[in-house]
Each structure stands twice: as structure tokens, then as C-alpha cells.
Regions:
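Exposed boundary/loop context
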Residues: 3, 12-13, 27, 43, ...
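Amphipathic, charged alpha-helical segments and their helix-to-coil junctions
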Residues: 36-74, 78, 94-129
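Sec/Tat signal peptide C-region and signal peptidase I cleavage site
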Residues: 22-34
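Bacterial N-terminal signal peptides that target proteins for export
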Residues: 2-23
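Short, well-ordered alpha-helical segments
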Residues: 75-91
């Protein structure tokens, strides 16, 4: 697992920005980055309201019993798609499935989550951090 963490950290051309929500290259920011920044702001606000949270699988999810707006769901989907692309790229050539990278990131995201936000643990339960 330590080797995978080192490998995952070694992907300098990609960065998970502010909670793993956006992909950028080190060379330049693009309009896609601006779109993901907007999605991040929407997601951060929804996290603060307790509508969505980080999951151990490396993706954002809707907290049980909550009904986020279409805008929040779209932003969450946009970020999850970007995360999947990062996990897939990290896995390419590593001999490991993308799910390994997703779970490593999920653990980090949960650890970095702000107090008072919801996180979904390995047992599938949402808990307020």
C-alpha cells in the first residue's frame, strides 16, 4: 500500500484541487478548470449545509434523507467525473485498478473534511465529522 501511495503522489502533472474536486495541468489553467472551480464552490456550500459529503470510495455522495438541488447534483456529478478521470489516469500503467487510487483519495478526503460535514464510512453509514 505504501508503494501505491508513493505512486499516486508521483503524478505531478495532475493535482486534486481543494478536496480533490478539480483536475488541472501544471502547464496552464483552462476554461474547464474555471467550470470545475464553479462546481467546487457549489459543492462546498452543499457540504456545509449537510446535503452531500465525501465517501470512502473517493467520490462525493448525497447524504441519506437529503434532497440537494439539481445544480448541486450537477456540480457533484461534474466533480465525480473529473475524479474518475484522475483515478483512471493514475491507474494506467500501474498494474492497479482505479478503485485503489479512488479509495486512497477517499481516505484522504475524509481526513481533510471540515468538522460538521458528513462523511460516509466503509460500513456505508453517514456520520457527522
Amino acid at each position: 500500500m505504501a508503494t501505491l501511495k508513493t505512486l499516486f503522489s508521483g503524478f505531478a502533472a495532475l493535482a486534486l484541487i481543494a478536496g480533490g474536486s478539480a483536475i488541472i495541468t501544471l502547464a496552464s489553467a483552462t476554461p474547464v478548470h474555471a467550470q470545475l472551480s464553479s462546481a467546487k464552490a457549489t459543492v462546498d456550500a452543499a457540504k456545509a449545509r449537510g446535503e452531500i459529503g465525501e465517501q470512502v470510495d473517493g467520490y462525493l455522495g448525497v447524504v441519506t434523507g437529503k434532497s440537494p438541488s439539481t445544480a448541486v447534483r450537477n456540480a457533484m456529478s461534474e466533480i465525480n467525473i473529473a475524479r474518475k478521470a484522475v483515478y483512471t489516469k493514475a491507474a494506467t500503467g500501474s498494474g492497479q485498478p482505479a478503485t485503489v487510487f479512488a479509495q486512497l483519495t477517499g481516505e484522504k478526503q475524509i481526513n481533510k473534511s471540515a468538522q460538521g460535514t458528513y462523511v460516509k464510512d466503509a460500513t456505508g453509514n453517514w456520520k457527522k465529522k
